[in-house]
């Protein structure tokens, strides 16, 4: 998946250059290729913008992006690609599963858990469903949307604040009364802070995009910078490389299943702490070093003290910092995507939305960095 991501990012860069040059057909082709290799919010946003402009007919914005007449061949190619996806083989069981997910009215029904399900119950349910409905494994019509809905359900229910808000508001029907465009809705109401593919990679292996990130080790701060490697080549070379990536993608589900079966043996018992209050772990404590709040059971003090407690609190702080770092990365990525879309389509509303992102996790990450540096 790592090589797919790099190639997908390169396809997005080529597509951006094509947009600026007015070559709409080439831009759409490379954006579609990027989505096949490694789905991303940036490529998806650009493709959706193309679709909106296509439906707008010969309006000013459509003419500005195309800088010329539309090519009927591009639409035929797009339709042919879509029909080929739905034509892949699938079982009746897979189709029935997709229909079940579609009919679910609440996120609890989607994951098949009770309303008082704990963190471990949510994780187990997500692992099982994510593997079953991942688009690389399940080719039934609607499987991709079902996979997105499963990821969105876990992302909301695993976040205490979003879950509390969701429980107060109600089912998915109430969230969608004001926008009946058909299908599943992932961009309004209760939005997940992470894409379904990123969530899947966090569970089953895979990293975050390269860039400037903070890492913490042995109580000290360390700053590392990874640079993107720019590749050059012709379009025909890009197309030939697809064969190797496709083979790797086909083998991924088998590799993931093997890893899950090996790791499941080590994930049976619940951790002795939680970063958020939950059933059985409601007693609040703070770490001695960073003053990070965590929650434990009533008999915690009788089991953890001295060196054992110090080691546990070190793990808690590392867990907290990793959480903040990942959330900061998502905030930066979201702001970057919106700013780029605002620049390309000259949409002031997107720019205002990007600037309104609070970046709370990045502020917290800077605070921790200053703390480790003695600031």
Curated annotation (Swiss-Prot):
Chain ranges on the Cytoplasmic side, renumbered to this chain: 1-242
Chief place of localization: endoplasmic reticulum
One Gene Ontology cellular component: endoplasmic reticulum
Membrane-spanning segments: 243-263
Pfam families in the record: DnaJ, DUF1977
Residues of the J domain: 106-170
An annotated GO BP: chaperone cofactor-dependent protein refolding
Residue numbers spanned by region Disordered: 48-95
Keywords, alphabetical: Chaperone, Endoplasmic reticulum, Membrane, Transmembrane, Transmembrane helix
Lumenal compartment spans: 264-375
Transferase as UniProt keyword: no
Subcellular locations according to the entry: Endoplasmic reticulum membrane
Domain of life according to the entry: Eukaryota
Annotated CDD domains: DnaJ (cd06257)
Membrane topology note: Single-pass membrane protein
Entry's family note: Belongs to the DnaJ family. DNAJB12/DNAJB14 subfamily.
Chain's role: Acts as a co-chaperone with HSPA8/Hsc70; required to promote protein folding and trafficking, prevent aggregation of client proteins, and promote unfolded proteins to endoplasmic reticulum-associated degradation (ERAD) pathway. Acts by determining hspa8/Hsc70's ATPase and polypeptide-binding activities. Can also act independently of hspa8/Hsc70: together with dnajb12, acts as a chaperone that promotes maturation of potassium channels by stabilizing nascent channel subunits and assembling them into tetramers.
Protein name: DnaJ homolog subfamily B member 14
Biological source species: Xenopus tropicalis
